[in-house]
C-alpha cells in the first residue's frame, strides 16, 4: 500500500524499470497547461509557461489584464469602454 500522500491523484504515476529488472512506480508532479484567456479560452501569447518559479507579475505582459485575457478581448473591451 502506498503512503497516504501518494494515494492522491494530484501526482501522476510513472512506471520505471530499475537496473535490477524490477518495475517500480515513481510519482511526479503533473505538467501544467498553457495559460488560457478567461473569456475565449485561447492560449495567451507572451506568457512563459515554462518559468513557474517566478511570480505572475514577472511572467505576464505589463498591460491591463495581462496574463488574464487575450489582446483581442482587451482591445474589444477598451473600444467598448471608450464608446460608452
Swiss-Prot record:
One of its GO terms (biological process) is translation. InterPro entries: Ribosomal_eL34 (IPR008195), Ribosomal_eL34_C_sf (IPR038562), Ribosomal_eL34_CS (IPR018065), Ribosomal_L34e_arc-type (IPR047868). The keyword Ribonucleoprotein applies. PROSITE patterns: RIBOSOMAL_L34E. One of its GO terms (cellular component) is ribosome. Pfam families: Ribosomal_L34e. Keywords: Ribonucleoprotein, Ribosomal protein. It comes from the Archaea. The keyword Zinc does not apply. One of its GO terms (molecular function) is structural constituent of ribosome. Belongs to the eukaryotic ribosomal protein eL34 family. This is Large ribosomal subunit protein eL34.
